[in-house]
Amino acid sequence: MSWQAAVEKTVTGFGYELVECERGSQGLLRVFIDRVPGQVYDGGPGEFVTVEDCEKVTRQLQYVLEVENCDYSRLEVSSPGLDRPLKKSADYARFAGERIDITLKLPFQGRKKYQGVLAASGEAWELHFNDGKQDQVLGFTLEEVRDARLVPVVDFKGRKGKEPAEPAAQVPGGYEQ
């Protein structure tokens, strides 16, 4: 069994999605996992990969890769991050309605990079975006895409700031108490 097949079988066996796996320099094997929507996990509910998820997959992968005699010196297992790549058709279906960055293989209207909201369109996909003048729709297939990633959304509006300190009581003469 190849190292890719061993990694995929192990990750999916635990109920996670294998987003990407790659070999780096100096024997690095990097694996990105994600939780499958609707699946129940030991670490509790939540849509994001936890440290415990990564630890569990790492321990099993170390064992499997040793048994399969796969050559590597370092193993990294992590979540794909907020800017998760979209690789498969299932990824596009899962994240339809989300804001994405897309890079095309060939330029369209003089550009390769676009940002907008992903939508399904039969067998193909659409990106709804505004070019600064008007709303536009870019139709594309997965074969035309070089790279696609979710646009990270970081919301600080729910965070409460520190309450302003009350001014010190003033005594006549301008001195603080």
From Swiss-Prot:
<dbReference type="InterPro" id="IPR003728">
    <property type="entry name" value="Ribosome_maturation_RimP"/>
</dbReference>
<dbReference type="GO" id="GO:0006412">
    <property type="term" value="P:translation"/>
</dbReference>
<comment type="similarity">
    <text>Belongs to the RimP family.</text>
</comment>
<dbReference type="InterPro" id="IPR035956">
    <property type="entry name" value="RimP_N_sf"/>
</dbReference>
<dbReference type="InterPro" id="IPR028998">
    <property type="entry name" value="RimP_C"/>
</dbReference>
<keyword id="KW-0690">Ribosome biogenesis</keyword>
<comment type="function">
    <text>Required for maturation of 30S ribosomal subunits.</text>
</comment>
<dbReference type="Pfam" id="PF17384">
    <property type="entry name" value="DUF150_C"/>
</dbReference>
<dbReference type="GO" id="GO:0005829">
    <property type="term" value="C:cytosol"/>
</dbReference>
<dbReference type="InterPro" id="IPR036847">
    <property type="entry name" value="RimP_C_sf"/>
</dbReference>
<keyword id="KW-0963">Cytoplasm</keyword>
<protein>
    <recommendedName>
        <fullName>Ribosome maturation factor RimP</fullName>
    </recommendedName>
</protein>
<dbReference type="Pfam" id="PF02576">
    <property type="entry name" value="RimP_N"/>
</dbReference>
<dbReference type="InterPro" id="IPR028989">
    <property type="entry name" value="RimP_N"/>
</dbReference>
<dbReference type="GO" id="GO:0000028">
    <property type="term" value="P:ribosomal small subunit assembly"/>
</dbReference>
